[in-house]
Swiss-Prot record:
Residue numbers bearing the Phosphohistidine modification: 185
Pfam families with a match to the protein in the record: GAF, HATPase_c, HisKA
Chief site of localization: cytoplasm
Motif interval(s): G1 box: 357-361
Family: Belongs to the chloroplast sensor kinase protein family.
Superkingdom as given in the UniProt entry: Bacteria
Organism of this sequence: Synechocystis sp. (strain ATCC 27184 / PCC 6803 / Kazusa)
Positions of the GAF domain: 16-152
Entry's cofactor comment: The 3Fe-4S cluster is redox-responsive, binds 1 cluster per monomer. It is coordinated by Cys-19 and other non-Cys residues.
List of residues binding [3Fe-4S] cluster: 19
Stretches assigned to the Histidine kinase domain: 182-432
Motif (G2 box): 386-390
Protein name per the record: Sensor histidine kinase Hik2
């Protein structure tokens, strides 16, 4: 069975160096004046890719020659004991892309030797010598060189296959790890709200003791879930530095689904912001109150229709409010406001949702990177815990909805220079124009 090389295969520097050394050996020991090592090219009928070509004492870059095309039957099939043909065999014409022409081939002074290992023919060794006839001892030496080149080519292909397989598996592993990190981060907001509501319910409870015990159980289980979540996040951040060993299954069984695929599949629809915002604001007002922060909402335009995705918008607003509350000190303020904007250059109508706070602000040098994964900037040096995922998730989801997200800091909401504040403005396409 003739082997072929994938178009993705790239011969290593080590293989090229080995071929060059073997070619030099042929030049010096057997007085060969032209020699070429060619590899089978997948998807090219009877085409062979030049790996190393030598003309006289000069090693020519393989790109200087084109494909070598061999008519049917010009290369004898390998025998069972892998011995070379007993007589020289012909070679077809060599096409080229440089000024260096191969020498004219005399039928009795050329050899085309198949590079065979097992049932795989991976290429050819093409040799021309203008002086002298080929003898038995020389043929044995050529056979040994052809065998060693065949083994080297197969091992190099195998190494390249494993490298490609490792890269694909590593890509899959990195995506899965990123996906889990996003899911864990998105779980934090509803879990925090659940725990806050449970504590508020417990404070206001005036019923029987049995029902109170049920509420206390909810609080305890919420705290337990939060501990498990933190533990899982910690283990994720310490993930293994290397991907587990590869299995023997083909690379084609690995299907990498990068986050970019979600851009094409996220369904968008027209809906009113009033269907999404009120419950989110209610939950975060309770969370803010527990931390002595005032959360206000100016949402007279709550019935504004946008073109977006409900679940994605919920995650975006949750993350922005969570950040606003987290980075605002006690006694601070978080404001939510809605507006309609028209961009004259494009003629498009946008609904803008601005979330402003009187928090610690974002330095100018951080504002360009704040939406990158795992980037926390100056906040990473503070005492407030975070993963640097929230705003990256926001940017990803907003992009998938065809919207925009901008940041302004300082925002002029606070007069305290130590708390310049930040405003994140979410731009959503108005549903009226779709």
């Amino acid at each position: 069975m003739a082997g072929s090389i994938s178009s993705m295969y790239s011969p290593s520097a080590g293989l090229i160096s080995l071929c060059q050394s073997q070619v030099r050996l042929l030049q010096q020991g057997l007085r060969v004046d032209w020699c070429g090592v060619y590899l089978n090219q997948e998807e090219t009928e009877q085409g062979l890719v030049p790996l190393v070509v030598s003309h006289g004492s000069t090693l020519v870059e393989s790109e200087s020659y084109g494909l070598i095309s061999l008519p049917q039957g010009e290369v004898s099939p390998p025998m069972d004991d892998f011995s070379l043909p007993a007589v020289p065999v012909g070679v077809g014409q060599l096409s080229r892309r440089s000024r260096l022409e191969p020498p004219p081939f005399d039928a009795d002074k050329r050899l085309v030797l198949p590079l065979v290992y097992g049932e795989e023919m991976v290429g050819l060794l093409v040799i021309h010598r203008s002086q002298g006839q080929w003898h038995g001892e020389e043929m044995m030496q050529l056979e040994a060189i052809a065998k060693s080149l065949a083994v080297a080519c197969l091992l190099d292909q195998q190494q390249d296959w494993y490298r490609q397989a490792w890269e694909e598996q590593n890509q899959q592993y990195q995506w899965e790890r990123q996906h889990w990190a996003d899911l864990l981060h998105q779980l934090r907001n509803p879990l925090t709200a659940l725990k806050t509501f449970s504590k508020l319910l417990l404070k206001r409870w005036h019923g029987d003791n049995k029902s109170q015990q049920v509420v206390e159980g909810i609080v305890r289980q919420g705290e337990h879930l939060q501990e498990l979540l933190q533990s899982f996040e910690a283990s994720q951040s310490q993930g293994p530095e290397a991907v587990p060993l590869l299995s023997s299954s083909p690379v084609t069984t690995i299907q990498v689904l990068p986050p970019a695929d979600r851009v094409e599949t996220m369904p968008l629809a027209n809906f009113s912001l009033g269907e999404v915002l009120p419950p989110i604001l209610l939950a975060h007002q309770a969370i803010a109150a527990e931390r002595n922060i005032t959360l206000t909402a100016q949402i007279a335009l709550i019935d504004t229709v946008v073109m977006a995705n409900r679940l994605a918008l919920r995650e975006v607003v949750n993350n922005l409010l969570d950040n606003g509350i987290k980075y605002t000190p006690n006694g601070g303020l978080v404001e939510v406001s809605l507006a309609l904007e028209k961009v004259s250059s494009s003629g498009m109508d946008w609904a803008t949702l601005a979330i402003a706070d009187t928090g610690y602000g974002i330095p100018p040098e951080d504002q360009q990177k704040i939406f990158e994964r795992n980037y926390r900037g100056v906040q990473g040096r503070g005492s407030i815990n975070g993963t640097g995922l929230g705003l990256a998730i926001v940017a990803d989801l907003v992009a998938q909805m065809g919207g925009k997200i901008t940041v302004t800091s300082p925002n002029g909401l606070s007069r305290d220079p130590d708390q310049p504040g930040s405003t994140f403005t979410l731009w959503l396409r108005s549903g009226e124009q779709v």
